[in-house]
Amino acid sequence: MESRLILDGAAGAPANLALEEALLRGNTSLTIRVWGNERSVIIGGAQLARYETDLDRCLRDGIPVVRRVTAGGAIYNGPGNVNWSIFLGREFRAGSLRYVWGAREVFRMAAGLVVRAAAGCGVRAWLDEPNRIVTPEGKVSGMAAYLSRSGLLCHGTLLLDADLEEAASLTEPAGVQLDRRYTRSRAMKVANTGIRPDAFIASVRGVVAEETGEEIEPGEPSESERAAMVALLPKYSDPVWNLGDPFEGRAER
């Protein structure tokens, strides 16, 4: 499998998250995905939706709340931000882009690419360990990762010109008694970068070319990856998976 850049999103938040897991399973080289999502809230694998969102509002307004396979905190998706994903097969090695074991090492590797891509767009950013990319104005991207014996996924959401007030209101639980068992999102000042999506994509391609010595060309999910996405879609569309308690065995892990 050659390195590839996947730019098209799937149809809707559940399908996009299903495709993320399908690519994690199927990728054996380097795949970078830059994609948008509908207005939605994406929660971490060990979170409880009602602790991380204004769930009543989301349900009332038809805003999907979808659990991802990676850990970490809740994020707002919608107009004004772009998601980036890095998939690396276990045997892939090219400069700083390589399979590493350990969440902090993965975050450092991924942040190196995103920070350099942001710099190429005129934005000074850096890694605030363990998993936040920040500028002088505030946090512009978080990161979450999943490691397996065959490969890894690290992804995040980069703020471009998002509605920060809506993002904050949708990821603020309303009148809920909290429980310490669940991973909680950490409040931090956030900021937009003002980067254009096309400029970010071009800059990412430039950084990858510097690291690998080759241009990363636009590609598509394979037939087997698309089939895996279709097979996974019922899970990511299931309220039990998305809204259920991750510690009570109701959501298949």
Task: Show which residues each predicted segment covers.
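Glycine-rich phosphate/pyrophosphate-binding loop regions near the starts of catalytic domains
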Residues: I75
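Catalytic beta-strand/loop module used to bind and position nucleotide/cofactor moieties
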Residues: D61, P79-E210, A228-R253
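Glycine-rich anion/phosphate-binding loops
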Residues: I63-V65
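Histidine-centered catalytic/metal-coordination loop motif
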Residues: R68, G78-P79
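Active-site loop/lid in soluble adenylation, ligation, and acyl-transfer enzymes
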Residues: M1-E52, D56, R68, L170, ...
